[in-house]
Design a protein with these regions (language model features):
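N-terminal glycine-rich anion-binding loop in soluble enzyme alpha/beta folds
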Residues: 2, 36-100
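Glycine-rich phosphate- or other oxyanion-binding loops that anchor nucleotides, phosphorylated ligands
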Residues: 88-127, 132-136, 183
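Short beta-strand segments
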Residues: 39, 122-124, 153-154, 318-320
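N-terminal acidic, proline/glycine-rich, low-complexity intrinsically disordered segments
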Residues: 1-10
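Generic beta-sheet signal
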Residues: 35, 116-120, 266-268
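Glycine/charged-rich beta-loop-alpha catalytic/anionic-binding loops adjacent to active sites
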Residues: 87-89, 115-120, 142-153, 299
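Mixed-charge interfacial surface used for oligomerization/domain docking
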Residues: 14-32, 42-50, 56, 61-63, ...
C-alpha cells in the first residue's frame, strides 16, 4: 500500500481544526426555495455549512455530570474540552437520548404553518429511536394540516456521512426535484455513501458495554486499533482490526481507493474527535490519489452524542462510492425489499 520510504508519512500538517480555512462550496449549494430540508445535529455539519445550505438543524440532547445540554455544534463547549475530559477521566460518560415526538411536533408544525414542502433526513434508526418519534410526529402534523407535504427519511448513515447526503439533497432540490422526489432520491442515494473510521482506544466501547472491559485492557496493551464501518441499516460494525494507529489510518485510505466513485464533483468528508493531526494526514493522502488534487474535502468534528460512544481520537473518512447494497448477500437483499414494502 505504502512504500516504507514514502515521505508522506512525515508530512503531517499541524494546523488545528479551529485554524482550518472555511470550506467554500460552489453556488449550487444554497438554500432551495421549493423544499425545506431539516436534519439533526448528529449529521455533524462543519461550521457554517448548514447555514449556507439553509438546512434547519434539530439538536439532540445529552446529559453530563453538570446537567442537560443540547448538541449545538460545539458553540457552548469546544470539542477539545469535551474530549480532553474523557481522556483525563476514562470513566466519564454522557447519557444520550432520542429526540421526543413532542419536540418533533413543535418543529414540524412550525414548518407546516410556513407551508413549504418539507423533508426530514433523520439520524439512522439503527442507532436511535428518533426516526420512529419523527414518523409519529409527522403523522400528527399530516392529520392536522392535510395539505402539507412532509416526508421523513431514515438517512441510514451516522455523522458526517449524513452531511454529504444533506449537501447533495440541497443540490438536487435546487436542480428542481420536488420534496417527494428528494425523499425518494435520498432513500436510494444513501446507499452510495461509504464511511470508515478508526478509534484511538477501546475505552469508549468498553464503557458503553459494547466490549468487555478486560478485552479493552488487553487490546490497549497490544495496541489494537479497530476499523469500523456501517452496514446497510446504518449500524456500526467492525470491519477489521489493525496493530497500531498508522496501519489503521492506512487501512482507511485503502478503503477509499477500493470504493471511491471518482466523481470529483462530489465532496469528501473527514471527521475527527479532537484528532485533527490524523485528519490532516488523511487529507494529504487523498490528495495524492489520481484526480483528487483539487477535490473539495470538508473537515468536521464529531459531536458529543456520537463522540461519547467512539471516544477521543476517532477519525473517519466518508465519501460517495459504489452501491453498498452490492456487497449484501442474496438473503439480505430480499430482507431489505421486504422492509421497504411494509
Amino acid at each position: 500500500m505504502f512504500n516504507k520510504k514514502d515521505k508522506a508519512e512525515e508530512e503531517i500538517s499541524e494546523v488545528a481544526f479551529e485554524d482550518l480555512e472555511p470550506t467554500e462550496l460552489s453556488a449550487a449549494y444554497h438554500k432551495p426555495s421549493n423544499v425545506r430540508i431539516i436534519m439533526d445535529s448528529c449529521a455533524d455539519f462543519a461550521p457554517g455549512i448548514a447555514e449556507q445550505l439553509g438546512v434547519d438543524i434539530i439538536q439532540f440532547p445529552y446529559v453530563g455530570p453538570d446537567g442537560e445540554h443540547y448538541d449545538d455544534g460545539w458553540k457552548s463547549i469546544s470539542a477539545h474540552e469535551f474530549f480532553e475530559g474523557m481522556r483525563k477521566d476514562k470513566k466519564l460518560r454522557y447519557t444520550t437520548s432520542a429526540i421526543t415526538p413532542g419536540h418533533y411536533l413543535e418543529v414540524f408544525e412550525r414548518a407546516a404553518k410556513q407551508g413549504t414542502p418539507t423533508v426530514y433526513l433523520c439520524f439512522t434508526s439503527a442507532l436511535s429511536s428518533s426516526f420512529y418519534a419523527a414518523e409519529q410526529a409527522a403523522d400528527m402534523v399530516r392529520e392536522k394540516y392535510p395539505d402539507f407535504e412532509i416526508y421523513v427519511v431514515d438517512n441510514g448513515a451516522p455523522s458526517s456521512a449524513a452531511q454529504l447526503l444533506g449537501l447533495e439533497a440541497v443540490h438536487q432540490a435546487n436542480k428542481g426535484l420536488s420534496a417527494k422526489e428528494i425523499a425518494e432520491w435520498a432513500d436510494d442515494a444513501k446507499n452510495y455513501i461509504h464511511g470508515y473510521l478508526t478509534l484511538e482506544t477501546l475505552d469508549a466501547l468498553a464503557a458503553g458495554g459494547r466490549i468487555p472491559a478486560a478485552a479493552a485492557n488487553i487490546g490497549g496493551k497490544l495496541d489494537v486499533k479497530p476499523e469500523l464501518t456501517y452496514d446497510s441499516t446504518g449500524a456500526l460494525t467492525v470491519k477489521t482490526v489493525c496493530r497500531g494507529r498508522k496501519k489503521a489510518l492506512k487501512s482507511l485510505i485503502q478503503d477509499f481507493r477500493d470504493s471511491y466513485s471518482h466523481d470529483t464533483s462530489l465532496p469528501v468528508g473527514i471527521i475527527s474527535a479532537d484528532s485533527q493531526k490524523d485528519a490532516n494526514w488523511l487529507e494529504a493522502q487523498i490528495r495524492k490519489e489520481k484526480g483528487c488534487e483539487g477535490l473539495t474535502i470538508i473537515h468536521s468534528q464529531v459531536g458529543p452524542v456520537i463522540g461519547d460512544h467512539v471516544g477521543p481520537g476517532m477519525v473517519a473518512i466518508v465519501f460517495w462510492g459504489t452501491d453498498r447494497r452490492e456487497k449484501l448477500s442474496l438473503s439480505d437483499r430480499i430482507a431489505n425489499r421486504v422492509r421497504k414494502s411494509n
